[in-house]
Swiss-Prot record:
Keywords tagged on the record: Arginine metabolism, NAD, Oxidoreductase
Classification via Pfam families: Aldedh
Gene label: astD
InterPro entries (alphabetical): Ald_DH/histidinol_DH (IPR016161), Ald_DH_C (IPR016163), Ald_DH_CS_CYS (IPR016160), Ald_DH_CS_GLU (IPR029510), Ald_DH_N (IPR016162), Aldehyde_DH_dom (IPR015590), SuccinylGlu_semiald_DH_AstD (IPR017649)
Descriptive protein name: N-succinylglutamate 5-semialdehyde dehydrogenase
Organism: Serratia proteamaculans (strain 568)
Pathway: Amino-acid degradation; L-arginine degradation via AST pathway; L-glutamate and succinate from L-arginine: step 4/5
Enzyme class: oxidoreductase
Example of a GO MF term: succinylglutamate-semialdehyde dehydrogenase activity
Residues forming the catalytic site: E246, C280
The enzyme's E.C. designation: 1.2.1.71
GO biological processes: arginine catabolic process to glutamate; arginine catabolic process to succinate
Reaction catalysed by this enzyme: N-succinyl-L-glutamate 5-semialdehyde + NAD(+) + H2O = N-succinyl-L-glutamate + NADH + 2 H(+)
Record's function text: Catalyzes the NAD-dependent reduction of succinylglutamate semialdehyde into succinylglutamate.
């Protein structure tokens, strides 16, 4: 049954747009139903954020800090409930969504540290005064959230934006509306002033209306490259608006020399199939050196991947992974596999739908070595490819043969190999003997090329949430001892 699912100026409201719903990805049972925000709802949310901005920006930082800390405490208190909500909507296992909520809590501490270090106040003494650097909020920021981490990734935009003094209009993915609703209720419970965060639910039309609003001063986005490019075009010619895009990747894992085969296979499994392959840093390409060592690695990879436990989020014992986000997404993944096979790829492990109409998919591994015209696409699911190479220079060239530039990784005991990769890699994240999906919130997160700009959702998020204000200051004014040539007071 539809319910008030928009949060505007501190109140829950019924949307005026079309009704939409969310179902369980595994069994298609209804989970959530409400009306989307139409253009007038979006306008009201942006107006509320604009009206709330002056007072929020002038609120002492210590008060903004305390409110964000209260939100973190509420996340801790409601961790199990929020994790279960995320699991039901995404089908990710409970063990994984509990870590997501914990990451949301940790992001508060990281954001507080980042605000002080990267966007606080600094002063440099000069002979006749001081040079002072301060930072000021942009104003109203639109935040677009993804479905794969519907709590953690929007949180990585919203928390630093609020700390900097911005107000927010949040548009979550239409595939995870309930997680967004539960999260906003915690912000409300934390005592957030009316209008500081507003939420509009809906799909493409809602998003386009928000991006087109003249009341926003910037847009922070995490999601697919296709949507990111669309938003970039929509905001073209508006340099006054900050635009931060974190998009996808066609990431390569280079398996060069193997000391422990099972350790290398575990790293590859974590890189390719964690979250059912629905992380932007997942390895879509595994590059394996030709030879018996590489053959043994691939054989073991297929063996272990074929035995992965897949199931419902609340199953016991817990599965390694659940399904993809929807039955439609599962269909797209199966179509992608079919296309790779039609091009000449060889199925080493065929991805299969485990239940009719369900989003549960088994992992797929396709050898595309020597196959021409393989699409440079991010297949967002449990499907990876194998490409064999002859030498390390060739591996690096293959890794860089993508319009994306998010992550690349190396399995090798040789530091020299990693140093080589660091020099040649075109990627924002370069890992050595660590899963591609591993990242530190204390480090930048993001890439180059079609993977986006700026570094959302991590320590460097503070950079795009405030603009620098430079001042030359002196408490008194005196005539210089030495005047400029041609200037006289005689």
């Amino acid at each position: 049954m539809s319910h008030p699912a928009l949060f505007i100026n501190g109140a829950w409201q019924q949307g005026r747009g079309a009704e939409f719903s969310k179902t369980d990805p595994v069994d298609n049972q209804p989970l959530w139903q409400a009306n989307a925000a139409d253009g007038s709802d979006v306008a009201a949310a942006c107006e509320a954020a604009r009206a709330a901005f002056p007072a929020w920006a002038r609120t002492p930082f210590e008060q903004r800090e305390q409110l964000v800390k209260r939100f973190a405490a509420l996340l801790e208190e409601h961790k199990s409930h929020l994790a279960a909500t995320i699991s039901r909507e995404t089908s990710k296992p409970r063990w994984e969504t509990l870590t997501e909520v914990q990451a949301m809590i940790g992001k508060v501490a990281i954001s507080l540290q980042a605000y002080q270090v990267r966007t606080g106040v600094s002063q440099t003494a000069m002979a006749d005064g001081a040079s002072v650097l301060r930072h000021r909020p942009h104003g109203v920021l639109a935040v677009f959230g993804p479905y794969n981490f519907p709590g953690h990734l929007p949180n990585g935009h919203i928390v630093p934006a609020l700390l900097a003094g911005n107000t927010v209009v949040f548009k979550p993915s239409e595939l995870t509306p309930q997680t967004a609703e539960e999260t906003l209720k915690l912000w409300q419970q934390a005592g957030l002033p009316d209008g500081v965060i507003n939420m509009v639910q809906g799909g493409r039309e809602t998003g386009e209306a928000l991006a087109a609003s003249t009341d926003i001063d910037g847009l922070l986005f995490t999601g697919s490259a296709g949507t990111g490019y669309h938003l970039h075009r929509q905001l073209a010619g508006q340099p006054e608006k900050i635009l931060a895009l974190e998009m996808g990747g066609n990431n390569a894992l280079i398996v060069d020399q193997i000391e422990d085969c099972d350790a290398a296979v575990n790293l590859a499994i974590q890189s390719a199939f964690i979250s059912a392959g629905q992380r932007c840093t997942c390895s879509r390409r595994i590059l394996v050196k030709r030879g018996s060592e590489g053959d043994a690695f691939i054989e073991r990879l297929v063996q272990v991947a074929s035995a992965l436990r897949i199931g419902r989020w609340d199953a016991e014992p817990q599965p390694f992974m659940g399904g993809v986000i929807s039955s439609a997404a599962a269909e797209k993944m199966l179509a992608a596999q079919h296309h790779l096979l039609s091009l000449g790829g060889k199925a080493l492990l065929t991805m299969q739908r485990l239940e009719s109409g369900s989003a549960l998919l088994s992992p797929g591994i396709i050898d595309v070595t020597g196959v021409r015209d393989v699409p440079d696409e991010e297949y967002f699911g449990p499907l990876t490819t194998i490409i064999r190479y002859n030498d390390f220079d060739e591996a690096v060239r293959i890794a860089n043969q993508t319009r994306y530039g998010l992550s690349v990784g190396l399995v090798s005991p040789q530091r020299e190999r990693f140093d080589h990769l660091l020099l040649e890699a075109r990627a924002g994240i370069v890992n050595w003997n660590k899963p591609l999906t591993g990242a530190s919130s204390a480090a930048p997160f993001g890439g180059v090329g079609a993977s986006g700009n700026h570094r959302p959702s991590a320590y460097y998020a503070a950079d795009y949430c405030a603009w620098p204000m430079a001042s030359l200051e002196s408490e008194s004014l005196t005539l210089p001892a030495s005047l400029s040539p041609g200037l006289s007071f005689n």
